[in-house]
Amino acid sequence: WIGGMGILVFVLAFLPKSEGQNIHILRAESTGPQVGKLVSKLKLTARILYLIYIAFTILEVCFLYFGDQVFGHDGIYKMDLFSSLVHTFGTVGTGGFGIKSTGLAEYSTYSQMVIAIFMLLCGINFNVFYLILIGKFKQVLKCEEMWWYLGFIIVSTVSIAFNVYYSVDNLALGIAFKDSFFQVTSIITSTGFATIPHFSDWPALSQTILWVLMFVGACAGSTGGGIKVSR
């Protein structure tokens, strides 16, 4: 979870360094071709990024834990506090660590969708969330990489959903869309969670799309892996 945002960014946020040394640390840890300051001081920039990261963590734990309590669950397993914490750490850091051999297949649809949405969010450049917080929506709309990233997810989800729907017998279209959206966000962000037992059960076209997304990766400045959309 600490490594998701970057251990060097963590060091930058909480250890005293000169501004000249800080920029080298931030560039070394940055996952994209460019690195910029959100505010004038790099230490404050790192702290803002970590506060957003921590906020996502707290929100996802709450959604997972209280969601199953409030809305009920249609899965075999229920998201207790321990499960919520483990899966949240695996989601926001895009590390994908789980506690069941079947992945997330036997958790509720609600829990799967919460995790999918947070995987998608954590694949976006964290600078974008800061711009949203300070009300600079025009700059957010100009973020070309984010729109390409969302476009890849939408097109891939629709393509895989219909491909699977017409290739697998007795499969509801809603389930096809749910599983395809989850797997697309999981693969493009390099998280690796799964809601299906075996990808080999899917058609070759769907497997190929996921294979390509694995290399493309998420946005620069996110916690996701891959080559990055900006490149």
What spans do the regions from the language model cover?
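Membrane-proximal intracellular helices of multi-pass ion channels
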Residues: 1-231
